[in-house]
C-alpha cells in the first residue's frame, strides 16, 4: 500500500490522491513515468519525482525511518511492506504518570514469538534495546498517546526511530469504538474467561497483589493479560488493514 501512497507529498491530500488513482496513476512508478499531470506544474512534478525517488530508495533499502513523514493516522500504509519486520508492543505500568510511575511489564511479539520482561525479574533494557533494533515498524494500540511517550520518558533512546503504527487510529476511522478488548469482541475474538474482563486498572491491581504477597499466581495472570494484548493485536491489525484497503480500492 505504501507504494500506492502520495499523501506524504507536500500539498497532496486524500482527495487528490484518490484523483491520481482514478486516473490510472496507481503507484510511484506510474506517477514518475507520466510526462505531465493535470493541475501540477512542471517544476512541482520534478520535485515530486525526486521525492518519490527518495521514498523508493528508502523503502527498498528498508529504511523505514524515512516514513516518519507520515502522520500517525496513515502509518497503516506501511504494514503490508514491513509486517515481517514489525513488532507488536505493549507495556504495563504502576500508573499513568510517565514522570513518576514505572514500567512493570514490557511485552513484544514478532508475529510468531512473544517475549516478556518483568520489573525486578528479567527486565534488561540493554538487551531490550538490542532486540528492538531488529524491527522496522512498531505496532501498538493507543501507543502514540501512552506507551511510546511513557517509554521515551522512562527509558530514553530505548525505542528505535521508526514509525509507530497505532492501530487505534485505524479502528476509529473504520467505526470501531472502545479499547482493544472491545474491538476484539466486535470482531469475534474471545479471551479466556479468567482474563476476559481485565482492563488496565486490573493489570495494576495484579501487580500490587503480586508485590504484596509474592504469589506468582497474580504475576502469571498479569503476564498472560499482557501477552494476549500483543498477540491479539496482530489478529486485529490484519483484519483492519484488509478492511481499509477494501474500502479504498472498492
Where are each of the predicted segments found?
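Short amphipathic alpha-helical segments
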Residues: 100-101, 151-153, 238
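N-terminal accessory regions of nucleic-acid-interacting proteins
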Residues: 1-82
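Short phosphate-engaging motifs
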Residues: 27, 124, 146-147, 229-232
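Active-site catalytic pocket residues across diverse enzymes, especially alpha/beta-hydrolases
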Residues: 24, 155, 240
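Conserved RNase H-like, two-metal-ion catalytic cores of nucleic-acid enzymes
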Residues: 67-137
Amino acid at each position: 500500500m505504501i507504494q500506492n501512497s502520495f499523501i506524504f507529498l507536500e500539498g497532496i491530500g486524500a482527495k487528490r490522491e484518490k484523483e491520481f488513482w482514478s486516473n490510472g496513476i496507481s503507484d510511484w512508478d506510474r506517477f514518475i513515468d507520466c510526462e505531465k499531470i493535470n493541475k501540477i506544474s512542471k517544476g512541482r512534478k520534478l520535485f515530486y519525482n525526486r521525492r518519490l525517488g527518495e521514498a523508493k530508495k528508502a523503502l527498498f533499502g528498508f529504511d523505514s525511518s524515512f516514513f516518519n513523514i507520515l502522520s500517525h493516522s496513515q502509518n497503516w500504509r506501511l504494514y503490508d511492506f514491513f509486517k515481517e519486520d514489525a513488532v507488536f508492543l505493549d507495556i504495563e505500568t504502576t500508573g499513568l504518570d510517565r514522570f513518576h510511575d514505572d514500567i512493570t511489564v514490557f511485552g513484544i511479539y514478532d508475529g510468531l514469538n512473544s517475549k516478556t520482561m518483568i520489573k525486578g525479574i528479567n527486565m534488561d533494557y540493554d538487551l531490550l534495546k538490542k532486540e528492538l533494533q531488529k524491527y522496522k515498524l512498531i505496532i501498538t494500540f493507543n501507543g502514540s498517546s501512552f506507551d511510546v511517550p511513557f517509554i521515551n520518558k522512562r527509558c530514553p533512546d530505548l525505542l528505535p526511530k521508526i514509525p509507530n503504527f497505532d492501530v487505534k487510529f485505524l479502528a476509529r476511522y473504520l467505526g470501531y469504538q472502545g479499547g482493544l478488548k472491545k474491538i476484539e469482541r466486535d470482531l469475534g475474538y474471545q479471551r479466556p474467561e479468567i482474563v476476559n474482563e481485565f482492563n488496565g486498572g486490573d493489570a495494576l491491581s495484579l501487580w500490587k497483589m503480586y508485590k504484596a504477597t509474592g504469589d506468582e499466581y497474580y504475576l502469571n495472570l498479569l503476564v498472560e493479560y499482557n501477552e494476549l494484548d500483543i498477540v491479539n493485536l496482530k489478529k486485529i491489525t490484519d483484519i483492519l488493514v484488509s478492511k481499509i484497503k477494501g474500502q479504498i480500492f472498492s
